[in-house]
Regions:
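Aspartyl protease active-site motif detector
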Residues: 1-31, 63, 94-98, 141, ...
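Signature of the N-terminal lobe/flap region of pepsin-like aspartyl proteases
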Residues: 1-82, 86, 90, 218, ...
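Short linear motifs in intrinsically disordered
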Residues: 35, 49-55, 116-117, 163-164, ...
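Charged, amphipathic alpha-helical segments
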Residues: 42-48, 106-116, 213-225
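Soluble non-cytosolic domains of exported or imported proteins
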Residues: 53-57, 101, 105, 206
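Aspartyl protease catalytic domain
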Residues: 62-190, 257-268
Length: 268
């Protein structure tokens, strides 16, 4: 998974004990003994995520990414995946697309290697996250594909947090529910701005309970059977003085156990 909320590249290792960590048996494993480009590093690595912690050690090898090939990339070989969460996720490893400031063990980020190799048309990347799922979503390296957007981009400067430039952190001017401002971005330590992290590694909207409570109250209840989905208000985020609407279908999670089961909805 390509995760803008973290900055390390790691893959599950063939050295993972499947009897102790069953999740390793559910994924493709990297075996460095089969690589002629592998170089040992050996430094221990621990990677904390909101979904769980995994650990292992650093290694070096050639990274092939789309049609790019980059030698001597330092990455994590994970041989410990405790907990059920790693068994349930559909991906094998994580490619951190965050800034260097949050990289564990201060290793270079995967995208930093691409920039240093001067292989890109521009030092940018973009995501198109499709409502139809992963099969139709796109990561573009070195720019943005015009087939996936209309109009002009709104450019926003990244912000630091406690002096650390690690997350894709931007300032939000306001949050409106059904066109009404609730003053959610007032009274923050950063002034009258909401600091927001753009994180492709999570599919939910999160925030401080105190700030979210009036927002949730204004949205109202979501029927578990999804029957009132189309009556819910838009959430409008204001960035750089421009409004961006989020329709209910994009902030309500619809899920069902199988094709024969009814849809169930909840805020997300």
């Amino acid at each position: 998974i390509f995760d803008t909320g973290s900055s390390n590249l790691w893959v599950p290792s063939a050295q993972c004990d499947k009897s102790k960590y069953p999740s390793c048996g559910n994924h493709s494993l990297y075996d460095h003994t089969k690589s002629s480009d592998y170089a040992s590093n050996g430094e221990k690595l621990t990677l904390p995520y909101g979904s769980g912690v995994c650990s292992g050690f650093l290694s070096q090898d050639t990274l092939t990414w789309s049609n790019f090939s980059i030698p001597s990339v330092v990455f994590g070989e994970v041989n410990q995946e405790p907990g059920a969460v790693w068994s349930e996720v559909p991906f094998d490893g994580i490619c951190g697309m965050g800034l260097p400031g949050i990289a564990m063990d201060k290793v270079e980020t995967p995208f930093s290697y691409l920039m240093a190799a001067e292989k890109l048309a521009s030092n940018t990347f973009s995501f198109y996250l499709s409502s139809l799922g992963a099969a139709t979503s796109v990561l573009t390296l070195g720019g943005a594909d015009p087939k996936y957007y209309e109009g002009e981009f709104t450019m926003l400067p990244t912000q630091t947090f406690l002096g650390n430039a690690g997350y894709w952190l931007i300032n939000g001017d306001d949050i409106k529910i059904g066109g009404e401002s609730l003053g959610s971005c007032k009274g923050w330590l950063s002034g009258n701005k909401c600091k927001m992290v753009v994180d492709t590694g999570t599919s939910v909207l999160t925030g401080p309970t105190k700030k979210l409570a009036p927002i949730l109250a204004k949205i109202g209840n979501v029927s578990s059977d999804c029957s009132n989905l189309n009556t819910l208000p838009n959430i409008t985020f204001t960035f750089g003085g421009k409004d961006f609407d989020l329709e209910p279908s994009f902030y309500v999670i619809r899920a069902r156990d199988d094709a024969a089961s009814p849809w169930q909805c909840q805020l997300g």
